[in-house]
Amino acid sequence: MNILIIGANGHTGRNLISQLKQNNQHETTAMVREEKQGEELKELGADHIVVANLEGDMEHAFTEIDACIFAAGSGSKTGPEKTITVDQEGAKKAIDLAKSNDIKHFVMLSSVGADSPEVAPEEMRHYLTAKQNADEYLMKSGVPYTIVRPTSLSNEKEQTLITAKVSLPDKSLTISREAVAKTLIASLTMMEAKNEVFEITSGLKEVEEALKYIH
């Protein structure tokens, strides 16, 4: 499959590219805002580069694409306007294009708390509301999907064992971006993850094993 990675230049996006290169099972198309970002991602292992912007025209990014991983985000520290533009409306635009281009699978990187943003700390509500709106839009779109909601992210290396549940009993732990990327990739092909929404955090199981028992 040719996998379009939206948010390819972010920490998780870079993890996705390097892991997919190591797996050598899929082609990767990295979507970037600037050509120079693409040069760096080519060195990291991206097979193709497409320059496009969530806030502008991106229809050409979906040419000859089989599946999409949406790992873009404005970050929880940006203001509401930017968050809505990227995390909500940008995601919706990508979902619409996925549908019109008959994309086989759309994997969304969401966040723990997106199911109930109203109970989150006030400074996080705009971010989680945008994530919730994007998730719900994807679920109603008719595009085959997986929505992955990690706990707080860390940059720890080689920490790839996880716990995956529809609703985690303990949401206070962190999870490495490396483990998140591994989960997003596994979700592309595992039937247990198709049309599912689940939360992940650090744990004791390999990703593929954990995804078999999310319920």
Feature locations, PLM:
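Conserved catalytic-site region of short-chain dehydrogenase/reductase
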Residues: K77, V112-V119, L153-K157
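Conserved Rossmann-fold NAD(P)-dependent oxidoreductase catalytic core, especially the SDR/UDP-sugar
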Residues: I6, H11, T29-M31, K82, ...
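N-terminal Rossmann NAD(P)H-binding glycine-rich loop of SDR-like oxidoreductase domains
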Residues: I3-N24
